[in-house]
């Protein structure tokens, strides 16, 4: 049973640092919390669990034989075991437990050498060469201009990590006033290469059979540090940074006053409201109309005199405008002065300017105008593209612990693509690729994609946003560092990348835009089309239902079982209906990606269902790499991955079909 004592822990401290009001909502069963599983899924997708486990080998050559881990969830037993280990003059401990007043923390790693205690916070976050020179100068920046010129501030990217380790150091110092305390981060070192294949395979994830919410790592018996080769992690001392943070004021409190205030609020279950600012719009304590739970987000707005309901149009729906409007005291779209967005040009060479798109959204929202807008350039721009039209989508992963030898942390792995072609009235699911085996997939991925165009690239290739172009550039860099002996078709693969992509910043000068460089359909949407139905989002998950809402022709077409037939071929569907009476969004027509999977398997991956924009595929890929998976379960996951990726490229086809439909009406 979960302990009900209300200690201010590391995670609760982070919530209080984000917003004091959150301390009332967190762990409160009456309130919805969309982050309940997010931290686990993020750690799974990035390999965070494996980083935490392999980091133990930085403080012990044999952490399992040495029994350094405090595994119990029981507060009192964890404290007892920690204190017992600390009786030794020299010892390493993982998940060491400490309690001071109403604070309770578990230190990821701790080393005791006589009267010196070294504490380590382990994060699956990268550290690279540019960060190397002086960590303090990297973590603590200086304002160069403006009213604050010369003042120091904490690098926003590292803010919560650094406050976390400072919080831990404060408690350890209080408990051990006569000891020297050294505080450190352990991070994924992008300057190091792995020296073995399958480093991640040493540490598999399974569910704790005695706990519904705890996951545990399983590992080979007798594994030692020497078995792991080069460990791509780095220790970073942050004592100077912690000193700086402890001297900073937080909401007119000193550091010590603030953490004690948070502890008081949480212990006594007191809700202390704060003023609404732009951060509130990303609050996890929201609900949708179907939820029976309370919305902390709505209650905070109500406390500030603002009532939110399903019809409320909030400023965060206006593209790239949230902070600017909230700083003016505007929280609803009808409070915005649309004339503020008319001060710059309506158009640019691609179509709508950002200002005009924002203006359109504000005006349409105020007037309850549900009609979509099509820019006059639509006909000219769409008509210029050479036929046939190709649509590709990549699914990729980048993890802290590389799966393969001679790879850096967080190198991209391209494990899946889908490819549709639209040629006249004919739509075909032309190709796909999926590799979930524990091998480096990038070159076989690229070969397969190249073979899709074996007769040459005729027509126009479309992607949705920058991802596909970025990945091809990263594979280009990987290939440049290979020899033709190891990759015999290296030069052909490089030429193919240059043919269909544009160089990114790191490859500027390597080539000019390829003769068949992919066209970004996302940019066309942003510049040429606006639908109130998308609620300000340009994600393909919102644009697809928007164009279907706008097109009776497409609704009629895809309400029939024509997908996966002779009319429209498919590799993963048969006689499929994309739209039906209950669900007018193709993404909702598919069952949740892991619905069919037995929940008695190592991880309850039914929780993946809320992931989108590639998150589900990336997490599924990580699951297949990081867990013991039965063949029949693997096949089910792979089938679901293939269907979802196919839908992404079919979504692009439908969006483009709508553009073609519109230009024929002009």
Task: Identify the meaning behind each predicted range.
Residues 1-666:
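DEDD superfamily 3′-5′ metal-dependent exonuclease/proofreading module
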